[in-house]
């Protein structure tokens, strides 16, 4: 009986069709097809463009409203209100004003206490109170320095030097002088000198009675206004007391127009000495006397009356308080030195004085800057500048060699230990070899414990901060170093004088040349 024969035939897999389909080649990728189309298009003859233009004309109407809508949303409204910009300067100015007011209050309280303490009867010095008031008047109105005031006050009161008094006065006196000049502060019992001029132009005079109730409502002072007709009502200013203002070369004049006379105004500009214009302001008369006043006097009569009392006020320039803190030269001292060398009939114009002072100050500042640069180059180190990079470190190389020697020593010791341990395990080894191997194992275990304990203690006591080298922090991203005091020596000045051509033939160069180079023992 023969066994049936079977033939293995490949059947369908999961998801396949029962009848195998015809395999079709995959279509070419679109990029290849586009390339063929492009090549054919180059070979084709150009066609007329009337049809595409017609299509464009047909497609333009629906695009136009879309563009208009986009313009409608993108174009900002011309009438949109804009918010006020931020004013960080106003807050800083308010903080500075509050600090100045606080300094003024402290200084006034201190001066009042000083006057009260000096009023005590002293048989040895009966004029102590008057002398103290004179010192206070000088330091407030006559620009006496705080050092002179402190020294004279110690002599008058016969007291010891107070270390905190001079810094306090240097910090608070500028604010007090500014407030006194503006008329917002005063010290009881201390009157200004006769020639003192305030910022608002008024000069110290006898106290006036308070104005009536009808004049209580004050109006803000306006700028200079010119009255078109001298026969009109005289000018009025609500500020109490007669004022005398020294204005610059050309004041701003606002014409009042063809209307009636203004209740507030100033008389026409009057030519004064040195090209200045003197303007006189009068106190406001009562309302019932306005109709009975006579016409204003002509301008020529006022020039003769006001020329003498204002000569002292215009002789010197009034600088705002605090403007000369950073100045090397004070114009008042320069003016005094110039006038001493001139004849009594000569005068110094303000513009020339300011030009000389500014030129000399600029020259001195430039020389000081150059000398500071020379001193910096003299004392600078090679590690600090960013132009130098550390390319070799001898200490690190020595440390590396020491580490290599230590590793070789440890390797040699470990080999000896292994040989001893191997010999101790041999049955033929003596008792001394076994004891020596055990002792070495005990020492190794103790040394390992000590190393682990020391590492744990160092990790617990040390911080996480890593010490970086100085040259790693140099670069544009690092912060600027703190400004430090530069010590300029005579050697720096000698080098600058010899190199600068502006010192050729000057007295200082000849003096330093005859004296020879300076020797600094501290270097």
Curated annotation (Swiss-Prot):
Q: Key word Transcription present in the record? A: yes
Q: What is said about its interaction partners and assembly?
A: Component of the TFIID basal transcription factor complex, composed of TATA-box-binding protein tbp-1, and a number of TBP-associated factors (TAFs). Interacts (via histone-fold domain) with oma-1 (via histone-fold domain). May also interact with oma-2. Interacts (via histone-fold domain) with taf-12 (via the histone-fold domain).
What would you give as a GO molecular function for this chain, any one? DNA binding
Q: Which residues form the signal peptide?
A: none
Null mutant phenotype reads: RNAi-mediated knockdown causes arrested development at 90-100 cells and inhibits differentiation. The two E cell daughters (E2 cells), which form the endoderm, divide abnormally early, immediately after the MS2 cells. Phosphorylation of the RNA Pol II large subunit C-terminal domain (CTD) is reduced severely in embryos. Abolishes expression of a range of genes, including let-858, rps-5, hsp16.2, pes-10, cki-2 and sur-5.
Q: What is known of its domains?
A: The histone-fold domain mediates hetero-dimer protein-protein interactions.
Question: Record keywords: Transport included?
Answer: no
Function (record text): The TFIID basal transcription factor complex plays a major role in the initiation of RNA polymerase II (Pol II)-dependent transcription. TFIID recognizes and binds promoters via its subunit tbp-1, a TATA-box-binding protein, and promotes assembly of the pre-initiation complex (PIC). The TFIID complex consists of tbp-1 and TBP-associated factors (TAFs), including taf-4. Essential for early embryonic development, probably acting via activating transcription initiation by RNA polymerase II, as part of the TFIID complex.
The record's Gene Ontology biological-process terms are: determination of adult lifespan; embryo development ending in birth or egg hatching; regulation of mitotic cell cycle, embryonic; transcription initiation at RNA polymerase II promoter
| GO CC annotation terms, alphabetical | cytoplasm; nucleus; transcription factor TFIID complex
Keywords (alphabetical) are: Cytoplasm, Nucleus, Transcription, Transcription regulation
> Which stretches of sequence are listed as region Histone-fold?
329-383
What species was this sequence derived from? Answer: Caenorhabditis elegans
Q: Where is this region: Disordered?
A: 1-100, 185-241, 407-435
* CDD domains named among the record's database cross-references: HFD_TAF4
Q: Which residues form the TAFH domain?
A: 101-199
Residue ranges of the region described as Necessary and sufficient for interaction with oma-1:
333-382
Q: Where is the composition biased (Pro residues)?
A: 78-87, 204-213
Checking SMART domains in the record gives: TAFH
What is this protein called in UniProt?
Transcription initiation factor TFIID subunit 4
Q: Could you tell me where the Low complexity compositional bias lies?
A: 58-77, 214-236
Similarity section? Belongs to the TAF4 family.
Which InterPro entries is this protein grouped with?
Answer: TAF4, TAF4_C, TAFH/NHR1_dom_sf, TAFH_NHR1
Q: Name one Pfam family in it.
A: TAF4
Native organism taxonomy: Eukaryota, Metazoa, Ecdysozoa, Nematoda, Chromadorea
Q: Gene for this protein? A: taf-4
Q: Where in the cell is it found?
A: Nucleus; Cytoplasm
């Amino acid at each position: 009986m023969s066994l049936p024969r079977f033939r293995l035939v490949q059947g369908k897999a999961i998801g396949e069709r029962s009848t195998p389909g015809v395999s079709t080649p995959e279509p070419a990728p679109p990029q290849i097809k586009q390339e063929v189309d492009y090549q054919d298009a180059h070979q084709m003859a150009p066609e007329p463009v009337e049809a595409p233009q017609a299509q464009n004309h047909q497609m333009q109407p629906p695009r136009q409203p879309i563009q208009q809508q986009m313009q409608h949303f993108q174009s900002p409204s011309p009438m949109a209100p804009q918010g006020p910009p931020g004013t960080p300067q106003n807050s800083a100015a308010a903080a500075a004003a509050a600090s100045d007011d606080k300094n003024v209050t402290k200084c006034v309280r201190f001066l009042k206490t000083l006057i009260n303490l000096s009023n005590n009867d002293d048989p040895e010095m009966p004029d102590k109170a008057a002398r103290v008031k004179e010192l206070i008047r000088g330091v407030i109105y006559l620009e006496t320095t705080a050092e002179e005031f402190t020294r004279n006050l110690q002599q008058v009161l016969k007291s010891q030097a107070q270390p905190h008094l001079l810094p306090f006065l240097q910090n608070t006196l500028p604010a007090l002088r500014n407030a006194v000049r503006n008329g917002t502060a005063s010290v009881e019992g201390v009157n200004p000198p006769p020639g003192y001029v305030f910022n608002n132009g008024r000069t110290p005079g006898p106290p006036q009675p308070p104005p009536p109730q009808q004049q209580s409502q004050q109006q803000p002072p306006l700028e200079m206004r010119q009255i078109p007709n001298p026969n009109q009502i005289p000018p009025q200013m609500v500020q109490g007391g007669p004022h005398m203002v020294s204005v610059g070369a050309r004041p701003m004049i606002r014409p009042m127009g063809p209307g009636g006379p203004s209740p507030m105004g100033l008389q026409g500009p009057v030519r004064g000495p040195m090209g200045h214009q003197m303007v006189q302001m009068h106190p406001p008369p009562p309302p019932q006397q306005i109709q009975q006043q006579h016409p204003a006097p002509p301008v020529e009569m006022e020039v003769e009356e006001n020329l003498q009392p204002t000569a002292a006020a215009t002789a010197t320039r009034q600088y705002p308080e605090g403007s000369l803190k950073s100045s090397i030269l004070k114009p008042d001292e320069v003016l005094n030195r110039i006038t001493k060398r001139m004849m009594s009939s000569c005068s110094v114009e303000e513009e020339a004085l300011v030009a000389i002072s500014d030129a000399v100050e600029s020259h001195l500042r430039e020389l000081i800057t150059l000398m500071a640069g020379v001193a910096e180059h003299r004392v600078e180190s090679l590690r600090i500048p960013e132009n130098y990079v550390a390319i070799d470190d001898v200490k690190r190389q020595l440390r590396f060699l020491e580490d290599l020697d230590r590793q070789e020593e440890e390797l040699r010791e470990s080999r000896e230990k292994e040989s001893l341990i191997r010999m101790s395990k041999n049955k033929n080894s003596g008792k001394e070899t076994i004891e020596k191997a055990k002792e070495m194992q005990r020492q190794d275990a103790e040394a390992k414990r000590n190393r682990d304990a020391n590492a744990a203690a160092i990790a617990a006591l040390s911080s996480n901060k890593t010490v970086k080298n100085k040259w790693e922090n140099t670069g544009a991203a690092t912060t600027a170093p703190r400004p430090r005091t530069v010590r300029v020596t005579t050697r720096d000045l000698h080098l600058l004088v010899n190199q600068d051509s502006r010192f050729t033939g000057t007295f200082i160069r000849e003096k330093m040349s005859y004296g020879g180079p300076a020797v600094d023992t501290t270097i």
